[in-house]
Design a protein with these regions (language model features):
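Short glycine/serine/threonine-rich phosphate/pyrophosphate-binding segments
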Residues: 34-35, 89-94, 202-207
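Gly/Ser-rich helix-loop-strand patches that form or flank binding pockets
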Residues: 97-107, 114
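ATP/NTP phosphate-donor binding region
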Residues: 3, 14, 18-80, 84, ...
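Short glycine-rich anion-binding loops that position phosphate/pyrophosphate groups of nucleotides
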Residues: 87-89, 110, 199-201
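Gly/Ser/Thr-rich active-site loops/lids in small-molecule metabolic enzymes
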Residues: 187-232
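Catalytic core of DAGKc-family lipid kinases
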Residues: 112-191
């Protein structure tokens, strides 16, 4: 993978050295309350002689006809991508630009906003710094799910956060067989299975009792059984060089494989899903004033006074 932006590697990330002349902005087009912020960003970038590109969509095409680009141009020509919205919009954008090496940052207009680190009130000042090349980036690994049915690959898809195997409308538990590098690990009954990257460890997996993984750990991922009817089986972190295979043992239908909470794939009995590290990754722009652990404190409400010693 070739990064045209990288100049110097430091402990805080990768410094950017290329002059920024084109920025793509992805926004939830139905969130018209975000349009005033978008207008302010466009005005700033126009004043800095930076071209703004927007994706094709009815609302955006009507309001910004000269800035809308087709999907291919939007992806190919962007030097940096700004996302206005919640984590869902960010993940959708990240998957769109995965493997391109294009840095992405998010301005939070949603609720929790783990990935959208920038608040609307600080967006303009940061974008001004960004145009002056005053920012760093960090890579985030992605995982790949390959669905095998009757010995043939049905689909292959990458994910940034997590992939989840769940039952549909049935209340009965499902049975899943797990293997790591073709070695049998366990066969359990439960509500499903979560496979998460370090980035996704603070999403569904965290709610299901999984551990938090620091995203800078780019060499491992986790699997987390959902409500297993087996006290001994617990979440496990495994190296990214290992392949996890989950086989569907349940006899009833209406099972789903959900990718990043956005793509749902129906599963059948004896389907096999192989999970491994994807060759693609996502490049995130670092917040200049916040560390990962500060974001954790804020987003998860830990909020302990740092001067407390007891």
């Amino acid at each position: 993978m070739l990064y045209l932006f990288i100049d110097v590697l430091s402990s805080s990330g990768l410094y950017i050295s290329v002059m920024i002349t084109k920025i793509a902005i992805n926004i939830n087009p139905d969130d018209t309350d975000s349009f005033p912020l978008l207008d302010s960003i466009i005005d700033l970038l126009d004043a800095r002689n930076v071209t703004v590109m927007l994706p094709e969509h009815g609302n955006l095409t009507d309001k910004y006809p000269h800035r809308v680009k087709d999907n291919e141009t939007f992806i190919r020509e962007a030097q940096v991508v700004a996302v206005i919205g919640g984590d869902g919009t960010f993940i959708r954008t990240a998957r769109l630009f995965s493997g391109t090496g294009t840095p992405i940052f998010g301005i939070n207009r949603g609720r929790l906003g783990f990935l959208n680190e920038f608040h609307p009130g600080e967006a303009l000042s940061f974008i001004d710094q960004l145009v002056d090349k005053n920012f760093t980036v960090s890579p985030r690994m992605m995982m790949q799910a390959s669905l095998q049915r009757d010995g043939e690959e049905i689909t292959r898809i990458d994910f940034l956060n997590d992939a989840v195997i769940t039952k549909g409308s049935f209340s009965r538990p499902i049975r899943i067989r797990l293997e790591i590098d073709e070695e049998f690990l366990s066969c359990y009954s439960g509500d499903g299975l979560i496979i998460a990257t370090a980035t996704g460890s603070t999403a569904y997996s965290l709610s299901a009792g999984g551990p938090i993984m620091v995203p800078q750990d780019e060499h491992s991922y986790l699997f987390n059984p959902i409500c297993p009817h087996m006290l001994a089986i617990r979440p496990m972190i495994i190296p990214d060089v290992m392949i996890l295979k989950a086989s569907i043992v349940s006899e009833f239908e209406n099972l789903l494989l959900t990718i990043d909470g956005q793509v749902a794939i129906e599963l059948e009995r004896q389907d096999e899903i192989r999970f491994k590290r994807s060759p693609s990754e996502v490049i995130l722009v670092n917040h200049p004033e916040k560390t990962y652990f500060e974001v954790l404190r804020q987003k998860l409400g830990w909020g302990v006074n740092r001067n407390d010693t007891g």
